[in-house]
């Protein structure tokens, strides 16, 4: 396994994105024959391109977590046409990451219908241009990118662990993260009362910052889930595809979408290039456990992941996440403890 890229903590910049666009990751060649791969948000962009690669590399079963079954069917048909994989390979399961009930239903289906899951790629994410609450009462990016992603990860851990034990080699749980987590100012997340509450407040919402904030919080979640899992059974990591020409800004107004699209056109990777990182992240060894996978390397995360203050805030936030999820499901902490 490669060592860290640099001792400099992760941070985004135009020059870094330019470099990344000129140095795309290697295209994975690992065979996924005999493997069952789960991916959320595979309808478009990075998720679609990653799913396409998994199919082309011979995955025996692909589980698609999709909000829209109609769009899921379109993606399935497209991938089958391009890879000639059998219709029995791709399975569509409905998943609305804004709904706890939908997440629970999805996890139950996965656990009951599939004997094994060798890798789960938690790719679904949003970048809302305006403040909006989820049905569960949280700001939408906070809900989907952080709270719901944490919940789904915890619900999938037992299946991943059982698969790893039976196979005699670790499975993979991948959080799709972002180098933007390194740009977050500590003042935006520091709150003695509640970090969740602070990030959830409409008065604190700035669409230009919220996505990066949620990606920092997701990094914290990833590290704590990794701490709860044995790397010999489940390798948990975060993967950053860098700035990509993807559908992430699809909800932006035309005034916002135009400059966003222009920047991505000039210094962004293609969705196909970015998806290579999502695929290679589930081929990493135990040294990548709890790590930040970027540019085909284990990179150094941002300061608020590695510093003493960041770790202290991370502990506070993790307790808040567990408190929130335990209200929905009293078995959350038990599921984590059984994986450690």
Curated annotation (Swiss-Prot):
Q: Please name the catalytic residues of this protein.
A: 211 (proton acceptor), 215 (lowers pka of active site tyr)
Signal peptide range:
none
Record keywords, A-Z = NADP, Oxidoreductase
Protein EC: 1.1.1.-
In terms of superkingdom, the source organism counts as Eukaryota
Per the record, the pathway is: Mycotoxin biosynthesis
Q: Binding of NADP(+): at which residues?
A: 46, 71, 96, 123, 211, 215
Q: Which PANTHER family match?
A: PHOSPHATIDYLINOSITOL-GLYCAN BIOSYNTHESIS CLASS F PROTEIN-RELATED, SHORT-CHAIN DEHYDROGENASE_REDUCTASE PHMF
Function statement: Short-chain dehydrogenase/reductase; part of the gene cluster that mediates the biosynthesis of the cytotoxic leucine-containing cytochalasans, including aspochalasin C, aspochalasin E, TMC-169, flavichalasine F, aspergillin PZ, aspochalasin M and flavichalasine G. The first step in the pathway is catalyzed by the hybrid PKS-NRPS ffsA that utilizes 8 units of malonyl-CoA to iteratively assemble the octaketide chain before addition of L-leucine by the C-terminal NRPS modules. Because ffsA lacks a designated enoylreductase (ER) domain, the required activity is provided the enoyl reductase fssC.
Q: What is this protein called?
A: Short-chain dehydrogenase/reductase ffsI
What species is this protein from?
A: Aspergillus flavipes
